[in-house]
Amino acid sequence: MPAIASKQYSDDVSLLVLLLDTNPLFWSTTSITFSQFLSHVLAFLNAVLGLNQLNQVVVIATGYSSCDYIYDSSLTSNHGNFESNGTGMPAIFGSLLKKLEEFVTKDEELSKEEVSEDRIPSCLLSGSLSMALCYIQRVFRSGHLHPQPRILCLQGSPDGPEQYVAVMNSIFSAQRLMVPIDSCYIGVQNSAFLQQASYITGGVHHTPKQLDGLFQYLTTIFATDLHSRGFVQLPKPIGVDFRASCFCHKKTIDMGYICSVCLSIFCEHHKKCSTCGSVFGQSKLDDASSASDKKRKAPST
Amino acid sequence: MEKRVKYKSFVKDPGTLGSLELSEVMLLFVPNDPKSDLKLKVQTHNIKSQKYTKEGSNKPPWLNLTSKQGRSHIFEFENYPDMHACRDFITKALAKCEEEPNKLVVLTPAEQLSMAEFELRFKLLRENSELQKLHKQFVESKVLTEDEFWSTRKKLLGKDSIRKSKQQMGLKSMMVSGIKPSTDGRTNRVTFNLTSEIIFQIFAEKPAVRQAFINYVPKKMTEKDFWTKYFRAEYLYSTKNTAVAAAEAAEDEELAVFLKPDEILAQEARQKMRRVDPTLDMDADEGDDYTHLMDHGIQRDGTNDIIEPQNDQLKRSLLQDLNRHAAVVLEGRCINVQSEDTRIVAEALTRAKQVSKADGEITKDANQERLERMSRATEMEDLQAPQNFPLAPLSIKDPRDYFESQQGNILSEPRGAKASKRNVHEAYGLLKESILVIRMTGLSDPLIKPEVSFEVFSSLTRTISTAKNILGKNPQESFLDRLPKSTKDEVIHHWTSIQELVRHFWSSYPITTTYLSTKVGKLKDAMSNTYSLLDAMKQSVQSDLRHQVSLLVRPMQQALDAAFQHYESDLQRRTAKIT
């Protein structure tokens, strides 16, 4: 290329990291097919890239057993392929679909090796969130001139309670980095993880009611850059599902016990914290009173 | 039901104005004049018959109730419709009493209600319209009985009873030495006018005087002679000449009683000092008024003369008098004797003192405890071994060990749907097939139908605008204020009703009697009825408010669902026991 454009980023330059749910156990039960879903998503990504010439898009596939980067618009290998091979597909996403197919094949091989078959059919949200935050951290360290990053979770799988700690750690890291997590849940239930993620990080959470209008939802709500959100009214949550998962059985609870030392959450009373080793129930005052009771009883015997 | 009536015990009685309150269980007449003691309470099942005057005749609207004991109660109503309403109500109540003779046992506690309690309940229902609405909904429809309804509202009933407690009368703060005699000026005679109040105060502050009164009057001297000697002694104190006081005390042994220090007070003080914890660092045995030191203590008359040692026992300091007077005032009036007889007052005070003295006696166990505390206090801390606090050492484990230890829990307790390998394989095949389809055909054209897009956009706009109106910029405003008034009142009433039902429901478990089983059945039916009303209310609300009303109604339905679930499981368990 002749000359690289100089970095002059304004307020509305965005870096969108899209976490794409590719859990086959979810897509085999939905009313909309995965190909239709991909049509809407790819059109949406094209629209985001069209909003600003300097916008960047990264797509991370969230599978049943693994996660991986399947598209990065800032890579030079994705530029220059303008030949059209006769179909309606833009050539710019040819590599994305190719990598997606390779990822699904690898994910299938990994799932065969899994010994456990009792897992809730959830996707690895914590893994993809961690990979997204790693990518954003690299962008931050490349210099003070960088687009404003945000994460968009497109998910339909149910929440996996065993990932509660890892998901919450990712959410708090995103909060610390001031990276909002937008969430679009297309499953049948409510997702407590995504609700808490958007609430804590200041993103937008929405559950579309008509999946055949997904593109309209995406462009109306989630294409807004961070600068424009100060002027645009976006859907606000009426309530947030703040339930947590217990650390002993990995099930979702709304009332439980908590360790006052390390804040671990338990669904039933334990004598000892399995995380930090604190002993519950035995306190100094109880022993002091029992000791004084013994002292008082001795002379009267 | 409540009507204004005039009560007559016989036909030609001029009558007493008041209000007649009717319930299915009881008939209550309360006169308008609070001072009148003509209050009437009749149990419904005690009424044998009733007669009434016919409309159109020259007679006023009378209702004559005859009890089974043969008494007659005539009520004159303001108009004939009122009389007819009461007559019909009593007829229905009497019919119910005859239909259900076995249930009289259940109604027995109602008979034990006092008149004041019954009036208080009616008063509370009259004042609180919400309470009246709940009472009408549950008690008149026989979901709850009267006692069940009021058992959860004892605070309301008890609040009024607290007001009935009387305030205790105190004592004047004027000291006994402030009593001034009257004098005529021409002779040396002075006259003391003693009231029973003054005598009571003297007896309370000076136990020795009280004891002397009991001992001497009337055996050795009259009451007048007693008080003459008492004030003679007080006069001798007011003079500065203690030698004259000592001389008169030597001649008259009865006068000497008033001049000696009060032994009863000294004994009480010693007992109080004995109750003090000996571990306190306090010189409790030394005199706390410094009178044992020379040149300390002000005399009552304000002089500061040095007194001779042999007359030391005749001294009394102002501080002692002030302290004694303050103690008596703070103690208050411990007896309620209003008698003018001085002897009765003195004996009552003595008995009160003896009772309090017995209460304050030190028992053997208390002595033992004092000795233990005394021996423990003498230990020196720096010679003791350091105490070992029972604390476990804190250890933050490696997070990897923690997560690995939890793997066993996952395997031992499987959760969620089991996905077999075949299903996973088929799902992956389906997914790859979808990817192949989109690679071959590309993006669909059109990507989205225009009408679908418009519908999505419209619903989003409506949702966002509605949310803005609801949340708004006024944090004081709640969503309830935006509902129509009838809907808001309905929601609040449903919430109050459900709280009442759920409270009675959970307090009925465990079911140990047939009575509780019947009660739970009634409550369950009432809760089912309320559940249907909630659904009907949700459907009747306008479409734009329905979502918000659903959010408001959800916790109520969850509470009812929990109760239904417990009812079914408990019913199955009890049925299994019977089998």
Swiss-Prot record, chain A:
The record, for InterPro entries, names: TFIIH_Tfb4/GTF2H3, vWFA_dom_sf
Indicate where this protein is primarily found. Answer: nucleus
Where in or outside the cell is it found?
A: Nucleus
Q: Please verify whether the record's keywords include Lipoprotein.
A: no
Where exactly are the zinc fingers annotated as C4-type? 259-276
Question: Which superkingdom, per the lineage?
Answer: Eukaryota
User: What GO molecular function annotations does the UniProt record carry, in alphabetical order?
Assistant: zinc ion binding
Q: Output the Gene Ontology cellular-component terms.
A: transcription factor TFIIH core complex
The UniProt similarity line reads: Belongs to the TFB4 family.
> How does the annotation summarize its subunit structure?
Component of the 7-subunit TFIIH core complex composed of XPB, XPD, TFB1/GTF2H1, GTF2H2/P44, TFB4/GTF2H3, TFB2/GTF2H4 and TFB5/GTF2H5, which is active in NER. The core complex associates with the 3-subunit CDK-activating kinase (CAK) module composed of CYCH1/cyclin H1, CDKD and MAT1/At4g30820 to form the 10-subunit holoenzyme (holo-TFIIH) active in transcription.
The record describes the protein's role as: Component of the general transcription and DNA repair factor IIH (TFIIH) core complex, which is involved in general and transcription-coupled nucleotide excision repair (NER) of damaged DNA and, when complexed to CAK, in RNA transcription by RNA polymerase II. In NER, TFIIH acts by opening DNA around the lesion to allow the excision of the damaged oligonucleotide and its replacement by a new DNA fragment. In transcription, TFIIH has an essential role in transcription initiation.
* Identification of the protein by name: General transcription and DNA repair factor IIH subunit TFB4
Organism whose genome encodes this protein? Arabidopsis thaliana
UniProtKB/Swiss-Prot annotation, chain B:
Q: List the disulfide bonds.
A: none
For the keyword DNA damage, the answer is yes
- Chief subcellular location equals nucleus
**SMART domains from the UniProt entry:** BSD
Q: Sorted alphabetically, which InterPro entries does this protein's record hold?
A: BSD_dom, BSD_dom_sf, Tfb1/GTF2H1, TFIIH_BTF_p62_N
Residues forming coiled coils: none
**One GO term describing the cellular component:** transcription factor TFIIH core complex
The subcellular localization recorded is:
Nucleus
Q: Name one Pfam family in it.
A: BSD
Q: Which UniProt keywords apply?
A: DNA damage, DNA repair, Nucleus, Repeat, Transcription, Transcription regulation
- BSD domain ranges (all copies): 107-161, 186-238
An example of a Gene Ontology BP annotation on this entry? Answer: DNA-templated transcription
- Function of the protein: Component of the general transcription and DNA repair factor IIH (TFIIH) core complex, which is involved in general and transcription-coupled nucleotide excision repair (NER) of damaged DNA and, when complexed to CAK, in RNA transcription by RNA polymerase II. In NER, TFIIH acts by opening DNA around the lesion to allow the excision of the damaged oligonucleotide and its replacement by a new DNA fragment. In transcription, TFIIH has an essential role in transcription initiation.
Quaternary structure, per UniProt, is:
Component of the 7-subunit TFIIH core complex composed of XPB, XPD, TFB1/GTF2H1, GTF2H2/P44, TFB4/GTF2H3, TFB2/GTF2H4 and TFB5/GTF2H5, which is active in NER. The core complex associates with the 3-subunit CDK-activating kinase (CAK) module composed of CYCH1/cyclin H1, CDKD and MAT1/At4g30820 to form the 10-subunit holoenzyme (holo-TFIIH) active in transcription.
Instruction: Return the similarity comment.
Output: Belongs to the TFB1 family.
Q: What is this protein called?
A: General transcription and DNA repair factor IIH subunit TFB1-3
Protein species of origin: Arabidopsis thaliana
- Lineage of the native species? Eukaryota, Viridiplantae, Streptophyta, Embryophyta, Tracheophyta
